[in-house]
């Protein structure tokens, strides 16, 4: 599907038409605007309020039309703070949806929801813009090839492999490591992946956005000397922004990614942290617009809003968008409408467990809850599939035995079950891995483990060849050879202590 990019955003030639309205009412980030009869703007049109507040400060607020109220009034949601706005102020209808800069000039830059650079590096060197509201590609344009996307993270590649050009969700409650995992994936994939990446920070901490930017500059993903050679564009609408900005910033990032896919015909990585905040912002806006809340207080249009974003994230015959999305799980409840609605759109789900995080096993990926449509013998091969299934079966058996162990103790188990528990505990620890982005916290250098090495390691544990090694030797190591070397080191240390 080809985009027809325009060469002017709202605020250039479109403002010359001067379809003017006036503010009739302001309720927080929501404005009611009265227009002359027959001059009503369309839904999703961008409106601009320009003027001065009571102390003479310049005001420039962009809004998006959400409802037509009748009596020549529209209700719009502001994309920035509405401080200083007053009733009777002039509002300009731009006659088009919000448009943002697209193309190679966006790489290495940080944008807000309106596509304005916020990195103090001057204006963006492009006049090509694209509207943030577009329809999804038609069925006939979609690409259905199946291939695996290697991440270098053992637990992901073995148990819930990612699809190239697919949608992946990282589910987890507060503080279990979603953002660190996303940053590691950016580190591993964006470096190895020749194409471009777009990162959408939706309603997350400003500090994390800043850390990510600094890290990308250090690793060379953003080239400070020659910005044009950078590999990533960053779009941020953080926690302190009004709900309108948080609701639309995901679409801004997606629009930039779509241009690389459709016009430049590239394979693109789209990272979104956090898709729950997109839903949360939609819920806030829905309440402000006076809609009746639905299940658990969410907006009645939850599925539609999610679908309109997710259906545009897809692979076409021109290029692909592989999307990795962090999904906050409120109160660790996966049945909450926000994560539950997201599940339906994903090819792979990586579920992070608080129990594993509490044990200090990072990444805290739950081997039993995480799923992938790619884990089929015809796609990954018999050897990979068999190993993954045996790892899951052993983990499941260990989980079933935990109650018995808690009540009666390990000694009451049969010899076979004791062996299963010992191997499951080794595997649980072997699924942990030192991350490149966490080197400063852990003190251990990060490890990238290829898929073949991962499969070999788990086969050795399952076969019983490593039954004699202590389980702590498998904790936070890369491949299986490092685990055996660590076991020898531990044995040497214990002998010296004696």
Swiss-Prot record:
Subunit structure: F-type ATPases have 2 components, CF(1) - the catalytic core - and CF(0) - the membrane proton channel. CF(1) has five subunits: alpha(3), beta(3), gamma(1), delta(1), epsilon(1). CF(0) has four main subunits: a(1), b(1), b'(1) and c(9-12).
Biological source species: Idiospermum australiense
Enzyme type, top EC level: translocase
Catalytic function, reaction form: ATP + H2O + 4 H(+)(in) = ADP + phosphate + 5 H(+)(out)
Function: Produces ATP from ADP in the presence of a proton gradient across the membrane. The catalytic sites are hosted primarily by the beta subunits.
UniProt GO cellular component terms: chloroplast thylakoid membrane; mitochondrion; proton-transporting ATP synthase complex
Protein name per UniProt: ATP synthase subunit beta, chloroplastic
Mode of membrane association: Peripheral membrane protein
